[in-house]
Amino acid sequence: MREIVHIQAGQCGNQIGAKFWEVISDEHGVDPSGEYRGDSELQIERINVYFNEAAGGRYVPRAILVDLEPGTMDSVRAGPFGQIFRPDNFVFGQSGAGNNWAKGHYTEGAELVDAVLDVVRKRSEACDCLQGFQICHSLGGGTGAGMGTLLIAKIREEYPDRMMCTFSVVPSPKVSDTVVEPYNATLSVHQLVEHADEVFCIDNEALYDICFRTLKLTCPTYGDLNHLVSLVMSGCTSCLRFPGQLNADLRKLAVNLIPFPRLHFFLVGFAPLTSRGSQIYRALTVPELVSQMFDNKNMMAASDPRHGRYLTAAAMFRGRMSTKEVDEQMLNIQNKNSSYFVEWIPNNMKVSVCDIPPRGLKMAATFIGNSTCIQELFKRVGEQFSAMFRRKAFLHWYTGEGMDEMEFTEAESNMNDLVSEYQQYQEAGVDEGEEFEEEEDFGDEQ
C-alpha cells in the first residue's frame, strides 16, 4: 500500500540505516534471513510499507544502499542483518569522496548517480502506491552530503509529487569530525532548503548527551547513538505500519508541520528514555511521556527549544492509551508553556495515536517540532563557514572539482536568509501581518 523507498548514503547514512533496519525488522517479526517469525497478524498486515515480499515468503527491505567506497557496505553486509538486503540494491563506487562535498555532488558522485536512480526507479515501479522517499545521510561529509543532496534533487525532478524526507546528521557544536564540515553542511543545507519536504535534524553531540546523561551509558558507541535515531525513524512511520486510532503519514505530517515552504527543518525527540537499571522504578503514563517529550534534554539536535518558539509540533503516541487523556495532556502543556508557542497559529499540535508500542515498552511517543530555535544550529555552522571562507581556506579542494566560489557565496546567503526567516517568525505577533508583507517586498528589491 503506502510504500516508502529508503535510501542510505555515505558512511553515516549506512550505519544509521543498518540500525534502523534492525529495529524495523524486529518490530515486524522478521529475522535476519528475511523469514517471518512474528506472533501477531498485525505485524504482517502492512509490512509492505518498508518490505517487499520475495519468493518463498521472504521479506526484503525496500532499501537502497549507496556509498562511494565499499568499506561501510562490507561492514553492513557482515552485520547482524546484512544478509536481508537485496544484493543489487548495493550501489557503490571505489574512489571515495574524501569528505569533499564537490566530489560527492559533481564528480565522483555524479558518475554513480545514474546507477542509483536506476535502482530507485525499479524499486518505485514495484510499488502499488508509493508514498515517498526517506534518506539517511550526514551533512558534514562528502558522500552523504554531496551525493545525498544530488540524489534528492534528481529524485525530486523525477517524482515531484512524492514526499521527500531526510534524516540528516548535522554538525555538532563542539565535536567536529572533519575540518571542512562547515563548508559541506552549508552547501547541503542550500540544497535541502530547495529540494526536500521534511528534514529531521539530528546531531551526534545531542545524542551523546542523551546517552550519557539520561541513559547513563559511560562510553556510548555509535551503535548506541544510531539506535536512538532509529527509534525516531520508526516512530515517524508507525502509524503507516500499524493500526491506530488517529493516523498520520509523511504527507499529513508535512501539511501540519510546515507553515512556510522553506521552514521544514525539524527537531526530533523520543520518550521514554530511561537508563537500563531505572526502568522498573518508573511508571509509564501519558503525562510522564508528554513532559519528557517536551524536555529540552530529549531533543536529538543541539538547539534548545527554550531559546525559540514552536511554530508547530507533532506528537505520535504508541501503545494502548486513552485518546482523551492524550488530548488533555497536550492541551495542558500548550497552556502551561504558551509563551513557547507562536500565538498566530492556534492549536499548533498534531497528534496521532498508534495502538502497537515498540518492542519492550508499554507506551512510547515520538516528538517532531518545528521550532525557531533550529536557527541556532544554522547560525553556528554559518559562523564557522564565514570564518574559513573569508580566508578562502580549503577552497582549492572544491574549485579543483569544478566548483565556483559563487556557489559558496550563494549557499552562505541562502542559509543566512533561512536564519532570518526563522527569527522573523519568532518575533511575530498576531496583529503584525501587514508589516511583514511590506518587509518582504523590500527584501526582494535589494
From Swiss-Prot:
Cited InterPro entries: Beta-tubulin_BS, Beta_tubulin, Tub_FtsZ_C, Tubulin, Tubulin/FtsZ-like_C, Tubulin/FtsZ_2-layer-sand-dom, Tubulin/FtsZ_GTPase_sf, Tubulin_C
Highest taxon in the source lineage: Eukaryota
Protein name in UniProt: Tubulin beta chain
Keyword Ligase carried by entry: no
Location of this chain's protein in the cell: Cytoplasm, Cytoskeleton
Binding residues for Mg(2+): 69
Assigned keywords, A-Z: Cytoplasm, Cytoskeleton, GTP-binding, Magnesium, Metal-binding, Microtubule, Nucleotide-binding
UniProt-listed CDD domains: beta_tubulin
Main location class: cytoplasm
Origin species: Giardia intestinalis
Assembly mode: Dimer of alpha and beta chains. A typical microtubule is a hollow water-filled tube with an outer diameter of 25 nm and an inner diameter of 15 nM. Alpha-beta heterodimers associate head-to-tail to form protofilaments running lengthwise along the microtubule wall with the beta-tubulin subunit facing the microtubule plus end conferring a structural polarity. Microtubules usually have 13 protofilaments but different protofilament numbers can be found in some organisms and specialized cells.
Family in the record: Belongs to the tubulin family.
Region: Disordered, residue numbers: 427-446
Pfam families registered for this protein in UniProt: Tubulin (PF00091), Tubulin_C (PF03953)
